[in-house]
């Protein structure tokens, strides 16, 4: 059986749909594929094929998100650099390892911000014949590299804290430590507000946060708690100078918080790199939705994965009756999916119900 590929936009969004048409459909007049049943008048067919370059939304959707992400990361980088220098100077003068630990984490954040900006630039590059999906996953690689930086620096700081516990021959200027750590708390709160992305609504189609900005936000949120713990230890040392061991103890606590902040990122990104179903989507719910479309008899070879956090891809094989208008089925599937989920790319292969083989292992549903 010979197949013909058709490409068009779904609901005028940056979503491509690829459908494979069998020989039995060749003589049928194609229907408008940009229009859901009950919508307004049909557009000119132009060969019944609509491409992404016919829509300004399609080309501008991704770039608009990139601009917002870059603005947030640039603003966060500037603030992070200024307060990092202030903490290095203040921590050195105060003799506080906890403050220097906080400065080191700001250095980690600054590095991660710069890596994220670089990865965003890479992800905006056009696809090539070797990288046909483009450079979207450069964002994920940049975020994972920043997590690795956290682990390395945290290990060094824990080692220094152990030395202070074993050899407590050091002095701390608690007054300077309070001033510097208080400013650090304020700076990290500002960073968190800049990087925070509000999500309006709770359905699957709400846009997910950019991967790089999300990783940076988690870093900044962890630093808020870390800076607060440094401030608390500074107050303890100020009122009880004999309790100066609170400084290395605070370093241990901050290190644990920093490592804990990376666990969720690693979990989500590992699933993404393993081509798992994106967070917020359910395999069963997508299949059930497809089976509700008129003309759909069965669904198999359903695959859902992501290029990056906000670039979801779906491909599926759908069986229909021989008398069913496959173009109408495709239109129904496109409308159902695009109204419920935010998809970057959609591929549908229409097959005849008579060609289905119940014993085919590839057509079986995956395990739970």
UniProtKB/Swiss-Prot annotation:
Q: Which residues bind Zn(2+) 3?
A: 51, 53, 360, 363
The record's section on Pfam families has: Cation_efflux
Domain of life per record:
Eukaryota
Q: Does the keyword Zinc apply?
A: yes
- MF terms per GO, please? metal ion binding; protein homodimerization activity; zinc ion transmembrane transporter activity; zinc:proton antiporter activity
Could you list which ranges are Cytoplasmic topological domains?
1-78, 124-139, 196-216, 267-368
**Residue interval(s) of motif HCH Motif:** 51-53
- The positions annotated for binding Zn(2+) 2 are 52, 300, 317, 351
Q: In which tissues is it expressed?
A: Expressed in endocrine pancreatic islet alpha and beta cells. May be more abundant in beta cells than in alpha cells. Expressed in cubical epithelium lining thyroid follicles (at protein level). In the adrenal gland, detected in the cortex, but not in the medulla (at protein level).
Alphabetical list of Gene3D superfamilies matching this protein: Cation efflux protein transmembrane domain
- Residues that coordinate or bind Zn(2+) 4: 344
Coiled-coil parts of chain: none
What ranges does the Lumenal, vesicle topological domain annotation cover? 100-102, 161-174, 238-245
Q: Does the keyword Ligase apply?
A: no
Assigned keywords, A-Z: Antiport, Cell membrane, Cytoplasmic vesicle, Ion transport, Membrane, Metal-binding, Transmembrane, Transmembrane helix, Transport, Zinc, Zinc transport
Q: How does it sit in the membrane?
A: Multi-pass membrane protein
* Role summary: Proton-coupled zinc ion antiporter mediating the entry of zinc into the lumen of pancreatic beta cell secretory granules, thereby regulating insulin secretion.
List the NCBIfam families hit by this protein, alphabetically.
CDF (TIGR01297)
Family per record? Belongs to the cation diffusion facilitator (CDF) transporter (TC 2.A.4) family. SLC30A subfamily.
Kindly provide the name given to this protein in its UniProt entry: Proton-coupled zinc antiporter SLC30A8
What is the gene name? Answer: Slc30a8
């Amino acid at each position: 059986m010979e197949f013909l590929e058709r490409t068009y936009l779904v609901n005028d969004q940056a979503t491509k749909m690829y459908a494979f048409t069998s020989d039995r459909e060749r003589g049928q007049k194609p229907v408008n594929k940009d229009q859901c049943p009950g919508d307004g008048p049909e557009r000119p067919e132009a060969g019944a094929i609509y491409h992404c370059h016919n829509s300004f939304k399609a080309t501008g959707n991704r770039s608009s998100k990139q601009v917002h992400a870059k603005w947030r990361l640039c603003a966060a980088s500037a603030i992070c650099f200024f307060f990092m220098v202030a903490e290095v100077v203040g921590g050195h003068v105060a003799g506080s390892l906890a403050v220097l630990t906080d400065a080191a984490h700001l250095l980690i954040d600054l590095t991660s911000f710069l890596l994220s900006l670089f990865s965003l630039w890479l992800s905006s590059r056009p696809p090539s014949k070797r990288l046909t999906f483009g450079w979207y996953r450069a964002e994920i690689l940049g975020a994972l590299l920043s997590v690795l930086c956290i682990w390395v620096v945290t290990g060094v700081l824990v080692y220094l804290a152990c030395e202070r516990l074993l050899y407590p021959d050091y002095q701390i200027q608690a007054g300077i430590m309070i001033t510097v750590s208080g400013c650090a708390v304020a700076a990290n709160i500002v960073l968190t507000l800049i990087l925070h992305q509000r999500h309006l609504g709770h359905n699957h189609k709400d846009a997910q946060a950019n991967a790089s900005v999300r990783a940076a936000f988690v870093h900044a949120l962890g630093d808020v708690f870390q800076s607060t713990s440094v401030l608390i230890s500074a107050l303890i040392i100020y009122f009880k100078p004999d309790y100066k061991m609170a400084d290395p103890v605070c370093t241990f606590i901050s290190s644990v918080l920093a490592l804990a902040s990376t666990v969720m990122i690693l979990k989500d990104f590992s699933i993404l790199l393993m081509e798992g179903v994106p967070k917020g989507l359910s395999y069963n719910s997508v299949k059930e939705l497809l089976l509700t479309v008129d003309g759909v008899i069965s669904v198999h070879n359903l695959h859902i994965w992501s290029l990056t956090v906000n670039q979801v891809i779906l491909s599926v094989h759908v069986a229909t009756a021989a008398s069913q208008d496959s173009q109408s089925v495709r239109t129904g599937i496109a409308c159902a999916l695009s109204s419920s989920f935010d998809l970057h790319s959609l591929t549908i292969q229409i097959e005849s119900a008579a060609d289905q083989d119940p014993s085919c292992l590839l057509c079986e549903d995956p395990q739970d």
